[in-house]
Amino acid sequence: WQYTIDDVPNVRLSDARQYVTDPSAILSATARDSINAMLGRLEKSTGIETAVVMLPSIGDEDIFDFGHELFRKWGIGKKKSDNGLLILFVMDQKKVRFTTGYGIEGTMTDAMSKRIQTTLMIPRFKKGNWDGGMVSGVRAVAKTLDGSMQAEEDNGEDDLSDILIALVFIVGTMLIFIYAMG
């Protein structure tokens, strides 16, 4: 089945607690529930509206153009803050695309989007692990947008610099000791 923009059902219209449109059941019910819960918490804490769309095919349509058109048609994000995000996966193209509103581009940059896709999502998708790829990708997106991933990354960098300082101190002490013995 090949979807057009007009064929894609917007689940949010019938249930505002649903964030995943998956008409062909590519994801398991458990994965959809997990993603819906994460994105519900994200919207409650930040106001950011997110839609995840899983489609088997869009034919020869370009995923970039399809995503932008769907994003505009659905009006994802609040009008004043333009804080929406669409995560579109097209199975037969084996591609995932993030479309962001201007209001979150400073946080969900193209580089961050690509990093999440290439490190967390695409490797799992290549193995047919649609659930794992989408759940881990959405988790990273939610952490990025609510600020917790930045805090984790900052802590990681601090830990690394502390380790390097300790290592330099130990090596320096050993060299002084060896020099004093010789």
Q: Which functions belong to the PLM regions below?
A:
Residues 1-168, 182:
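Folded, non-transmembrane soluble domains that reside on the lumenal/extracytoplasmic side of membranes
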Residues 175-182:
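Juxtamembrane interface at the cytosolic side of transmembrane helices
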